[in-house]
């Protein structure tokens, strides 16, 4: 037994001339790895301006190749988190977001495609956000971050460090506690889409709306209280 319940394989989100190895040629390898094991295999694909053109091909080929295998879970589409130059060069347009929505809605294998909370903005379904609650990301620096989307972002607080603090201490830290507290109600509550969207991705809102301030708590509250930068309304 592998001692694991799931293995996630990240699919290349861009192709270079040097990349000539395809995951689809390695099915026998995966069959051997998961033989007589209860673990599942999932795939991650980050959707950005660079990878958008290959999205439909990647999703269809991955699902078609692995859906008959009992160990296959789903292919998860990860929403690109824009930082720095990526804010203008790699972020998706509203038209591209609609294309992603239609790709999912028109698929006959929806059960094999995972969108997740950051895609609630598409208005398809609500996946409850578990930031700072059911999820804790430990970085290489030992710091516990509330979500992958704001990993290594420390301008609004730090929960603690695994080298010095217990998981419970970091979960109950002021930073994590404030995120959970502020993520209950916000300015989008009156919107007809709110029951599905829930104002979008908290990590995306923090990255997009953060401004330097001495009052980190109020800044955090303002960011969480804002609309998702890719609001589809």
Predicted regions and their residues:
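Flexible mid-to-C-terminal extensions adjoining Fe-S/redox cofactors in radical SAM and related proteins
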Residues: 149-233
């Amino acid at each position: 037994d592998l001692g694991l319940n799931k293995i996630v394989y990240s699919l290349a989100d861009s192709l270079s001339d040097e990349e000539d190895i395809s995951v689809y040629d390695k099915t026998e390898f995966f069959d051997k790895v998961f033989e007589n094991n209860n673990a599942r295999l999932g795939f991650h694909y980050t959707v950005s301006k660079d990878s958008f053109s290959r999205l439909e091909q990647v999703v269809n080929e991955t699902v078609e190749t692995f859906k008959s295998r009992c160990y296959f879970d789903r292919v998860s589409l990860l929403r690109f988190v824009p930082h720095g130059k990526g804010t203008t060069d790699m972020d998706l347009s509203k038209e591209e977001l609609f294309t992603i929505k239609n790709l999912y809605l028109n698929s006959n294998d929806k059960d094999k495609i995972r969108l997740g909370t950051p895609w609630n903005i598409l208005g398809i379904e609500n996946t409850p956000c578990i930031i700072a609650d059911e999820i804790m990301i430990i970085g290489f620096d030992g710091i516990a971050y509330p979500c992958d989307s704001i990993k290594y972002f420390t301008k609004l607080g730090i929960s603690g460090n695994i080298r010095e603090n217990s998981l419970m201490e970091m979960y109950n830290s002021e930073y994590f506690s404030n995120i959970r507290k502020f993520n209950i109600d916000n300015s989008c509550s009156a919107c007809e889409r709110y029951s599905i969207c829930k104002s979008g991705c908290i990590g995306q809102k923090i990255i997009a709306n953060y401004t330097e301030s001495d009052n980190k708590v109020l800044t955090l509250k303002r960011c969480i209280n804002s609309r998702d930068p890719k609001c589809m309304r």
